[in-house]
Amino acid sequence: MQTGNEHGARAGAGQDAPLRLSLALSRVSQPDDPYAFQFAAQTYLVRAGDSGLAAAEWTWDQELLSDLETLRLRPWEIEPPQRVGERLRRFLAGTGWALEEHKLLEAVHRRQPVILTVSSTAAELYALPWELVSHRATGQHIGELPDVVLRYEWPDTQTIRERPVERGRILLAWSAAGGAVPAADHIAAIAGACSATQYPFDRDRDVLAHVSCESLVAALHEADARRSPISVLHLLCHGAAVGPTFGLALSSNSPDETVTVVDGPRLRQLLAPFASTLQLVVISACDGGNIGALGNQLGSVAQALHRAGLRSVLASRFPLSITGARKLAQELYGALLLRHETLEAAVVSVRDRLARSARQLDWLALQLSARAADGDVTRPLFVRPFRGLQPFRPEYRWAFFGRDVEIAELHAQILGLIDRREPRFVVVAGATGVGKTSLIQAGLVPALRAEPSPRWRTLELRPGASPIAEFTAAVAGLT
C-alpha cells in the first residue's frame, strides 16, 4: 500500500487524503509479451500493495467468456456479475490481497476515499472488470462500495508533460454517422454546468457537429492557434466493431462513404500531438474501453490514448445505454464544475448515479484510465480561484465569498432607488485593495443578472479626465 500525499479526492468535503491501493499483475509465461495469450489455465504473478509476489492461476474457459459477453449484452441477468466477482475473489485469495481488502473496508467504514490502481503487463487481464471483485462475507463488489474508484494503468507509460491552461475549453464533438445520438442532451448538460459557474462554453464555437477525423484535428489546431486550447474533449458517437476490437463511428468526408470507423491506434495518432493540453478525453460511445478479442494487439480506444500519454480517459467497456450516457454527462460536469470535485471523486459520483438503474450495468461499464504517478487530485478543468492582486470578475462569482451582506445591501439600495424613483446613483468607496471592484463585478453584477426579469445591462468604464464624456459615449453604445 502507498499512502496518498495530496488533498482528499472530494474537494472541500473535509475528508482525509485518499487511501492508495494497488494491484499489479503479470503473466508467468512469456511475461515480456503482453499479447502472448493462451485460451487455457494460466499462472499469473500478483503483487497487492507492498506485499511480495504471489502466484495465482486463472482459467480462461468458455463459461467465463459467456459470462463476460452476458455482462456486455444482457446486463439485466443477475447471476453473471456474482459469478465473475467470485472468480476474481478466489483468484486473489492466495495473494496479499486480503490485507489490502482489509484496509479498503476500514477506509470505507470511516468514509475515507479509496483509489485502487490496477496495472498488468498481460493485456488480456484488462478484459476483466476488476470492479466486480467480491468480498467473501458480504458478497459486495469493491466497485459498488462508497467512495471507491478504480483506475487502470498500463505499466511503464508516462503522461505527457502538462502545459497548464487556465480555463481551458471543453469541446463536445458528436457524430450520428453510426446512428442517432442524444447530442442535444449532452450539449444541455455541459452548457448548463458551464452557465451556472460562468465557465466559458460557446455552443457555436465549442460544439463540433458531425465530427470527422479531419474536422476534429482542425478544431484542435484552431483552438491552439487562438491560444485557447481544449482541456476536455467529449466524444459522443456510436461504437463499432473494427477487426478484432472496437472503434468509434465518426462521420466521413469522403463522398463514397458516410461512416469512418476509427480504431484506437488511429485516434491515438490524431490526439497525441495535443496531449500536453488535453487533460481529459470522455468517450461517450459503446465499447470505447473494450479491448476486443483476447490476445489482439490493438486494445481499446481508451487504452490506446492512455498509453500514448494522455492524462485521463473516461470510457465504457460495454455498450452504454442512452440514458446512461445522458446521466454521465449531467453528473460528470455537474461534479467538476458545480461542486468543484476532482475527477476521481466525479467518477464516483457518476458511478453512483448510474447504479440507480436496476436493469443496466452502466456503473460497471464506466472505466477510468489514468496513472498513479499523476496523483489523486486530477482537475481537468483548471480554474485558479485566488486572483492575487487581480479583482474578481463576474465569471468568478463561484469563487467569491464573504461579502453576502454587502452584496445584499447594494442590491437593496439600487432596487429601493428604482422603487422610489430617486436618482439611481450608488457610490462604493474604500481604501485601495479592500475589494471594491470585486464586490461590484463578482457580487452585485451577478446578483442583478440573476433577477427573474432580465432588465439589467452593465457597462464598465474608467472616468479619466472627462468622466461625463466617457459616460455619454458608453451609454450611447447601448442604443
What are these regions (language model features)?
Residues 6, 18-45, 347-352, 360-404, ...:
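Charged, amphipathic alpha-helical interface modules that flank catalytic cores or transmembrane segments
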